[in-house]
Amino acid sequence: MGARGRRRDRRLVGIGIVVPHIRPGVAQLAFLHVSDGFRGTGIGRRLSNELDRIARSAGDTTMVVSATPSESTVGFYRRRGFEPTASPLPELLELEPEDVHLEKRL
C-alpha cells in the first residue's frame, strides 16, 4: 500500500491511497480526497500522479477506481485518464455497487 498527503499551513488538505497488486498487474486507487477550498488547485492531480508512479513502480499496468457517481468526481477521474469499465472487478462491484467503476492503463 502507498499513501501520499498534502499539507497547507500545517493542515492536511489532501490524501490518497493506492493498493498495488489487488490482482496481477492491477492496482486500486482506494482513496483520494481533497478538502473543500483546496479543490481545483492541482492537489488532486499531483496526488493522483504520485499514486500512479507508486503503482507503476510496483509493476502494475492498470489502475482501477470505484468513484462516487457525481459529475465532478467522475469528471476528475476521466481527466486523469480513467474510463468507465464494462467489467468491474467483482469484489469492488460487491463493495460499491452504486459507484462508477473506472480503469486506466498506467
Where are these regions (language model features)?
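Conserved acetyl-CoA-binding loop-helix of GNAT-fold acetyltransferases
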Residues: 34, 40-55, 78-79
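Conserved catalytic-core motifs of GNAT/GCN5-like acyltransferases
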Residues: 64, 83-100
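Flexible loop residues that form catalytic
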Residues: 18, 37, 68, 85-90
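Short glycine/proline-centered loop/turn elements that form peptide/ligand docking sites
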Residues: 44, 48, 69-73, 90-96
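Conserved GNAT acetyl-CoA-binding A-motif
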Residues: 55-68
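Exposed loop/turn and edge beta-strand positions of beta-sandwich/beta-sheet ligand-binding modules
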Residues: 23, 28, 59, 96-98
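Acetyl-CoA-dependent GNAT
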Residues: 1-26, 30, 35, 48, ...
